[in-house]
Amino acid sequence: MADPAGAGGEQEAPSVEAAFAGQPPPPWWQQVTVRAVAVSVVLGTLFSFMAMRTGLTAGFVPSFNMSASLLSFFIIKSWTRLMARCGVASQPFTRQENVVVQTCVISCATLSIYGGFTSYLLAMNETVAKAAGGGTDGRNVYTLHTGKIVAFLFLVTFSSLFCTLPLRNTMIVDYKLIYPSGSAVAGIVNSFHTPKGATKAKLQVNAMFKSVAGSFAWAFFQWFYTGGDGCGFHAFPLFGLEAYKEKFYFDFSASLVGVGMICPHLINFSMLLGSISSSGFIWPALQAKQGEWYTDPSPTSFKGINGYKVPMGVSMVLGDCLFQLGAITVKAVQHYRKGRQEQKLAVDGAADDGGGGCVPDDDDENKWHATYDERRRNQVFLSDGIPDQFAVAGYVALAALSTALVPRIFPQIRYHHVAVCYAVAPLLAFCNSYTSGLMDWSLATVYGKLAIFVVGASVGAASGGVIAGLAACGVMMVVIGDAAELMHDFKTAYLTLTSPVSMFASQAIGTALGCVVNPAVFLAFRWLAGAEHPPGDPRSAYAAPMAVAYRGIAVLGVEGVGTLPRHAIALCAACFAAAVFLDTAGAAARAARWRVGGWVPNPMAMAIPFFVGPTFAIDMCVGSLLLMAWRRADRQGAATLAVVVASGLICGEGLWTLPSAVLAMLKVQPPICMKFLSRSQIQEVRQHFVLGAADIQPAVTLTHHHHQ
């Protein structure tokens, strides 16, 4: 008998296409339906809002693939049932249409990240320039008009759809790359369209709606206690008032707790470690050196303490990025060489055997079924071809158009810089798509950061090198990142018998939707934040840590390290070395299968608190702890519902920002201020109380605001 584990792995494949044998896939034009596009508009806007809000607050954006698949299934399934009850005939809801909606939604939401609204575009404005310090002169500050943002996105994003399109058959059919995210989405969608999977989906939708309602109600309840500066649950000094001054407190944010439930525990606790090491030890030590190492007291100047904070964080980010780039490149080369050797051995073996032979154990039937599934998928995937000439012509035309027009949007960048970016992007996109297919890890942001250094340094500070570098980063990130996302979607299409043409069309629709929706969502966040503390301001609810990091990278690339305060270069070198050491230690431990390998801190996550402080790290660690407790109590329930409950927590609090903004616009103020005070402030508090003032020893004060 064959090994049971191995047999199970083989038997999983035939159960998929055998279950759908009586449901031939519809032609591609029946997969991209009007109702699919309509649902995509609604869900794309919702998930863009969630992704951008998370990026503006925490810096890390979790994957919403499962939630998008679930909600698209639920909405269209409910729609078809409603039409049936009303006696209106409607097209059957297929898994192919489900994949089309999911692809449109994620394509739209992904642009909130790759589009730069939480990173390189936001890093161009004056608010982030002041927060990061350095490079604040006129040529290195640029506030984009919404129309220019839309034009830039349309120019750059559509070229990414053509970049690696001719390689889809090579990557998926020939190399058989896994593309873990794409495969996972396919597994989810295939399961939804079976009776057992539909029951599970209904349970998950109910849990998500309850989570959304609970998160919204909690945010509404908290609003009543925010009647003043520093009031409410979001300023709860969990670790004491001294720690509160260093931003060590729990702010009861349901959305950040939800993000913590989705993000890996390693990321969350790495951020906590970075928070403790920076705010607890490094910053107090540097503050004690004021007057000796630096004299500028401004907290945002590169001549002051910010000349240590931002460059040290940037050094850790770059150390981690360069290590990952080298490590993944080595793995990709090894995997490619191994695959070529196996193909050669297979050809030689077939020649020696005369092309015949049979398998001498009882895995024959399973392998035949696996071959059937593979043949069926290959047949559908290869039947609807997109001509390679169309892809090449589309990329060349859009690259030429972008080369001519992007410098008109960003006058600081030259035509030849854009042309070089488009010339090298296909090669880097292939490398990124290949490695993403192996390890589900996109290096688009790494290539973008390298573009900042190269282009920024070539332009120079006097000519606006900061803006030029950030613009080049945008071109590289969007083209390379979206090209890898498209390959994940093609893998989903392959495993669900969805036509590649409909997949390309849904990507184009989602991309066009994202180019319009995301600028509008960003405008909404600017309106919600207000003119006093706009996005990117350290005091804003949307501090945008990655925008500060990208700005710091651009300033360092243009101005060099010679402008930094005393000993800053040595500290940056130490942070860079620490990042490389941690990555090396983690890789070695995982290779040796040591249990500690999964708990070596992640340098990228450790660096985030260097830019915005430790507050959100506390919330995300609470999310990890809640998930650990849930898994201990009910592992199966946590595996089924944790992601959707977390998505509901993120969505519910995010939805509350809209009515709260309307209340603020109508000048409706919260009635109560809940504030935490030290004993030294008691005398001031007593002046506002009449009864029992002599006996009051509070640590918390509740004050009612009366409206006349």
From Swiss-Prot:
Q: Which domain of life is it from?
A: Eukaryota
Q: What is its main location?
A: membrane
Q: What is any one of the record's Gene Ontology cellular component terms? A: membrane
Membrane topology, as annotated, equals: Multi-pass membrane protein
Its name, as the record gives it, is: Probable metal-nicotianamine transporter YSL1
Recall the taxonomic lineage recorded for the source organism. Answer: Eukaryota, Viridiplantae, Streptophyta, Embryophyta, Tracheophyta
GO molecular function (one): oligopeptide transmembrane transporter activity
Which ranges does the record mark as transmembrane?
A: 32-52, 56-76, 104-124, 147-167, 216-236, 256-276, 310-330, 390-410, 418-438, 450-470, 503-523, 568-588, 608-628, 638-658
Function, as annotated = May be involved in the transport of nicotianamine-chelated metals.
Keyword annotations from UniProtKB, A to Z: Membrane, Transmembrane, Transmembrane helix, Transport
The record's comment on protein family reads: Belongs to the YSL (TC 2.A.67.2) family.
Subcellular location, record wording: Membrane
Instruction: Name its species.
Output: Oryza sativa subsp. japonica (Rice)
